[in-house]
Regions:
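Extreme N-terminal leader/targeting segments of oxidoreductases
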Residues: 1-130, 207, 251, 269-287
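C-terminal, flexible cofactor-proximal segment of oxidoreductases
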Residues: 1-18, 24-27, 32, 50, ...
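Feature captures the FAD/FMN-dependent oxidoreductase FAD-binding
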Residues: 56-101, 197-265, 454
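Conserved N-terminal/central alpha/beta ligand/cofactor-binding core
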Residues: 58-67, 183-213, 217, 363-420
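Rossmann-like dinucleotide-binding core of oxidoreductases
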Residues: 122-129, 134-150, 154-164, 169, ...
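Central helical "cap/lid" subdomain
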Residues: 272-283, 460-510
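C-terminal catalytic lobe of FAD-dependent flavoproteins
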Residues: 375-457, 462, 466-488, 571-624
Length: 624
């Protein structure tokens, strides 16, 4: 590999210097070099320079130029030094400016995956007649297909839409983008060094999953426009009887194992507003954005101010004649100036060409965003200072986020409308680069802290006054508590929906005592609101599922279901932990909760806990 000194020098100007410092161990084979370099401070989410002073960055850059050029003058890329696990741990400590707990080292090493050669799936030829049905071709479904193929298990995918992508296919509204840094929001084994933005927009994310879909030949096993409608487990044949509709034709078949990859956020939720059917203008949910222009020069209403509205409003405000937002409660926002920033070409070059740079950069994004926040999300029962915070640390964050918002507000009438009255992190935390509040200051934009009372043929009635609109957008979220809807699933003891309603019971959010030979990805209680990315959780889940299937095949077992007592123990611990956390606070109402105010969608666990549980399949937890 030939790297010019000039190219490297230019690229290093855009580098993360804690990462570059750690790379010097690879290039020199000397762990002690870290003792001679300026030390980064403790890493925080989104800060990739370790708060190093400019002079310290220059010191690291100068040494890096010397050592990297020396290495490539005398060695080949595949001769680079692979540190021992002990040395890798020291490198981790250096990069994040603190001692990485020994509890986390196996998980971080697993994700880091330092090896001389990039990941190549080792697909095994199928040796059994088992065929697994995967429902859904979104992020989790694609992942499940890749991992099943790796262990030699046949599969097919039924996807209700006419294309793949799930969330990133359906949510094509203006401004749609991920709110987890892209170099971590990706499969751990399938890096993309060419992301154009740090938090990519929907089209680029969809392209990423399409590339994975075709790279791993998943298209050969996928049936689009196929909606599973009913599933019933037959105890006699020990198989699922599955009904589906494919291109309008009904189909019935028998399947040994089913993996649901439908997720939680796929059924649009439109509020039941009196007179909804009378409105004569354009009206749609944010995830069903039309292909015609319903915005330009129009009077537009956006109902909701959560994650989707937060992205839509700044994107359409300048094109609308008038834009009115109906807000039930304001969101908390995490200051993030990088939210809309592009990844410059020099950063892309480092990620693509400097060995292990991308792996360590991913680690630097991962670790500060893993479990450090979780302790501050537990309610301190002695905390009496304020009702809009739950403990001292949470209150400090409330002050920080409030100050960041106040600095952006020149119209004082907005203050009461945009500062939440519930604790930070009680609802989904949004990424703030100033675009939301800037849009609210535009002369054609109005924020109303009022709910829609009813609708008329011309628009909306609120506070007894009719407001006329050409277009109404419902940014009102999804039916997250209706797990597996609209599929009617009966594991032999009755309909899953009728048994559990909106209070499902599961083990790890993956298996269910009432549903044999059935697994879920992004199932109940596995949404992440404090750490990581949903892809991390999905990788945990499919590793567990594959371990279970391999155990069944190697022991010639046809049926497995989690023991009811194991499920109950897990669910009791899940519920008890949530009782102490911010998401079940008395001032919080969100899609994390069911109709009784009980959290059912979101994980209360540390990532390391969940990784350990899913990394160790225990057959004693199951009946076969």
């Amino acid at each position: 590999m030939n790297i010019s000194k000039q190219t490297l020098e230019r690229a290093l100007d855009s580098a993360s210097f804690p990462v570059v410092a750690a790379l010097l161990v690879h290039f020199t084979g000397d762990i002690s070099i870290l003792d001679k370099l300026p030390k980064p401070n403790q890493a925080i989410l989104g800060e990739t320079q370790g708060f190093l002073a400019d002079k310290d960055k220059e010191i690291i850059k100068e040494i890096a130029l010397k050592e990297i050029n020396r290495f490539f003058s005398n060695s080949k890329a595949d001769e680079i030094y692979i540190p021992s696990n002990t040395e890798l741990n020291k490198m981790m400590n250096f990069i994040v400016g603190e001692e990485v707990s020994t509890d986390y080292i196996p998980m971080m090493l697993n994700d880091l995956n330092i090896a001389t050669h990039p990941f190549k799936p080792n697909f095994i030829k199928a040796t059994s007649n088992l065929e697994v049905l995967i429902i859904g071709a979104g992020m989790s479904g694609i992942l499940a297909a890749i991992k099943l193929a790796e262990i030699g298990v046949q599969y097919k995918i039924y996807e209700k839409n006419n294309d793949l992508g799930g969330t990133w296919y359906e949510n094509q509204y203006p401004g749609s983008r991920v709110d987890i840094a892209n170099h971590f929001y990706s499969y751990s084994f399938e890096e993309n060094h060419q992301w154009t933005e740090h938090f990519s927009r929907q089209p680029e994310l969809l392209d990423y999953f399409k590339n994975c879909f075709h790279k791993y030949d998943i298209h050969k096993h996928t049936y689009f426009e196929t909606q599973v409608t009913d599933m019933k487990f037959d105890e006699l044949t020990q198989e699922w009887s599955v009904d589906s509709i494919c291109h309008g034709r009904e189909n019935k078949e028998r399947i040994g194992i089913v993996i649901s990859c439908v997720g939680q956020l796929n059924q649009p939720k439109i509020p039941q507003i009196k007179g909804l059917e009378h409105f004569q203008g354009d009206m749609f949910h944010s995830s069903q954005w039309p292909h015609f222009d319903a915005i330009s020069g129009k009077k537009v209403a956006v109902v909701g101010s959560g994650a989707s509205a937060f992205q839509i409003v700044p994107s359409i405000a300048k094109f609308s004649k008038e834009l009115t937002i109906f807000q039930r409660s304001p969101p908390w926002m995490f200051p993030n100036p990088q939210y809309h920033e592009e990844v410059d070409d020099r950063k892309k070059w480092l990620l693509e060409n400097l060995p292990f740079y991308s792996r360590w950069y991913r680690f630097l994004l991962f670790y500060p965003g893993s479990d450090q926040l979780l302790d501050s999300l537990f309610i301190d029962p002695t905390w009496k200072a304020r009702s809009d915070s739950i403990n001292e640390a949470n209150d400090a964050m409330r002050e920080l986020f409030t100050s960041a918002m106040l600095e952006q507000i020149s119209d004082q009438s907005l203050v009461e409308k945009v500062i939440p009255d519930y604790p930070p992190f009680g609802k989904r935390m949004l990424q703030d680069n100033g675009a939301w509040l800037e849009a609210l200051h535009l002369p054609n934009v109005t924020l109303l802290s009022k709910e829609v009372e009813c609708m008329s043929s011309k628009g909306v009635v609120s506070s007894g006054k009719e407001l006329e609109f050409d277009t109404i957008i419902f940014a009102t979220g999804f039916k997250a508590q209706n797990f597996f809807y609209p599929i009617n699933i009966d594991g032999g003891s009755g309909s899953f929906e009728k048994i559990y309603r909106d209070s499902p019971s599961s083990y790890l959010g993956i298996t269910f005592s009432s549903l044999p030979n059935f697994f879920a990805m992004y199932g109940p209680g596995t949404n992440l609101a404090h750490a990581g990315s949903i892809i991390f959780n999905s990788e945990c889940q499919i590793n567990y599922i594959c371990s279970a299937i391999k155990y069944m095949l190697s022991n010639d077992l046809k049926v497995m279901r989690v023991k009811p007592e194991i499920e109950k123990q897990y669910q009791d611990r899940f519920d008890m932990r949530h009782e102490k956390m911010v998401w079940q606070h008395s001032k919080v109402s969100s899609w994390y909760q069911n109709s009784k105010g009980k959290v059912v969608t979101t994980s209360p666990w540390r990532l390391i806990e969940y990784w350990n549980w899913t990394n160790n399949f225990n057959q004693d937890d199951y009946e076969f």
